[in-house]
A protein has these predicted regions:
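Sec/SRP-type N-terminal targeting helices
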Residues: 34-38, 52, 84, 98-126, ...
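Small/polar, glycine/serine/threonine/aspartate-rich low-complexity segments that form flexible
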Residues: 62-96, 222-231, 263, 276-312, ...
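A short glycine-centered flexible hinge/capping loop motif at secondary-structure junctions
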Residues: 168-172, 384-388, 425
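Extended, amphipathic, non-transmembrane alpha-helical segments
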Residues: 49, 146-167, 194-205, 350, ...
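Periplasmic alpha-helical coiled-coil/stalk elements that build and connect Gram-negative outer-membrane
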Residues: 125-242, 355, 359, 401
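Short flexible linkers and secondary-structure junctions
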Residues: 14-139, 273, 277, 318-321
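Bacterial Sec-pathway N-terminal export signals of envelope proteins
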Residues: 11-58, 62, 70, 214-256, ...
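Acidic, low-complexity, intrinsically disordered peripheral segments
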Residues: 12, 69, 407-433
Length: 433
């Protein structure tokens, strides 16, 4: 687990954010996660609608009111008359598809898979955000460390310059050496300024990824996260990823949906059967005549019906066959995408393991080089103070020391990220590391 050496503070504005804190904050405030969450909500609604379409009928009620002026038919005598009349009707009906080519059943299965796809896309978005935050966080740590190293170099150069100026006054150091040391100090100050600017820039990038409030300063833990446990074997990681990788599972579910849509298109060539039932009643009056009261007409004019409907597709300009052909092509595309995605995931995992192993070797070498260069730097610093080497020779040793420090930090953080990626492919979410 990617633990950190210090803990966060109590207030958010003054708290020290660890790597885990930054990833957690980014996931909970990311607009991408909000979009994915809304899409998952749509998928759940589609799932609910598909369930209702299979198990519940369609029910509707209607009513209308109208006045008739002029010639019309008397509903009592079924003869024409010219009196003004008032009509009011009420009805309720229900319908249920007994057989629709299994369209509703297939839609139910497709919606269930669609919900799984949406939830996996949400998890994939979470992983992408965590990885981006991790990389940005490591960049901030790298440039913060570089900034601190250059600040130490500036302080050391100032100390050496002051000592050289005193030695010049005593006649033990030439003016040319002092000028070279002043130039060295100016160079170190310039590099320190650049490193500090880069640190602030990468800190702003991290803040943007986290959606951190603009009016608040982001303070991260300067301690470097510890290394994860022993690396996982390549084959075990590949086997797990080919079964559980979100993008590959999404591609597999899309193949399943394409196959179901092809089956549904074929079933649409068969007749559809529906059962319908309803009840209606009416009320009417005529100007200048006596009619039955509303409650009596409401009861007496009521009627019911039951309808069995069979629809047989005969000729629809080959639209059914065209739909089948298009769904078959969609299945071929989905299968090809799945095969390509499976190959890509396998290659990505193997490359990630290879990058992790290479980063581990590079880090060990950089650590050894940094230790040697640090010892050489300390010896050269003493030699410079004693006047045994020139400032130009010391600059070369100092540059080698700075480069070794930067390489060690960079290789360590690179190994940290590569190991986290491999562990993610092995089934450990970034937030759980």
């Amino acid at each position: 687990m990617l633990s950190v050496l210090t803990t966060a503070g109590t207030g958010r504005a003054q708290s020290v954010m660890t790597l885990h804190d930054c990833m957690e904050y980014a996931v909970s405030h990311s607009t991408k996660m909000r979009i994915r969450s809304a899409e998952s909500g749509d998928a759940r609604i589609a799932r609910r609608d598909a369930v209702l379409a299979v198990f519940t009928p369609q029910v509707s009620a209607s009513t209308y009111v109208y006045y008739n002026f002029g010639r019309s038919i008397d509903p009592q005598t079924n003869t024409w008359f010219t009196q003004t009349s008032f009509h009011n009707s009420y009805g309720i009906s229900a319908g249920f598809n007994l057989f629709d080519g299994f369209r509703a059943v297939n839609n139910l299965r497709i919606s269930a898979t669609g919900l799984l796809i949406s939830e996996s896309q949400e998890k994939q978005a979470e992983a992408d955000i965590c990885l981006a935050v991790m990389e940005a966080y490591c960049n901030v740590l790298y440039y913060k460390r570089l900034d601190d190293v250059y600040a130490e170099q500036v302080a050391a150069a100032e100390t050496v310059l002051r000592k050289a100026e005193r030695e010049e006054e005593l006649g033990r150091r030439s003016h040319a050496d002092v000028v070279q040391m002043e130039a060295e100090l100016a160079e170190r100050r310039y590099e320190s300024t650049n490193a500090h600017n880069a640190y602030r820039s990468h800190l702003m990038t991290l803040s943007d990824l986290m959606f951190w409030p603009l009016e608040e300063e982001l303070v991260i833990d300067p301690q470097v996260p510890r290394l994860p446990p022993e690396p996982l074997r390549a084959e075990s990681v590949v086997d797990f990823a080919l079964t559980h990788d979100p993008s590959l599972r999404i591609a597999g579910w899309q193949v399943d949906n394409a196959r179901r849509e092809l089956s549904a298109a074929r079933w649409q060539l068969l007749p559809s059967v529906g059962l319908y039932a309803g009840w209606n009643t009416s009320y009417y009056t005529y100007a200048g005549t006596q009619t039955s009261p509303f409650d009596m007409q409401f009861r007496n004019n009521g009627g019911e019906y039951v309808q069995l409907s069979v629809s047989v597709p005969i000729f629809n300009r080959l639209q059914g066959h065209s739909r089948i052909a298009m769904k078959r092509n969609a299945l071929d595309r989905a299968t090809a995408v799945y095969d390509q995605k499976r190959r890509d995931v396998g290659s990505e995992v193997r490359r990630a393991v290879q990058d992790r192993d290479g980063a581990a070797v590079a880090w060990r070498q950089a650590r050894s080089k940094a230790a040697v260069q640090e010892e050489a730097y300390n010896l050269n610093l003493k030699s410079l103070e004693q006047g045994l080497i020139s400032p130009l020779e010391f600059r070369t040793a100092n540059n080698n020391y700075l480069k070794a420090q930067a390489d060690e930090m960079n290789s360590y953080l690179t190994y940290l990220i590569r190991q986290a990626v491999v562990r993610y492919y092995g089934g450990v979410d970034y937030l759980d590391q």
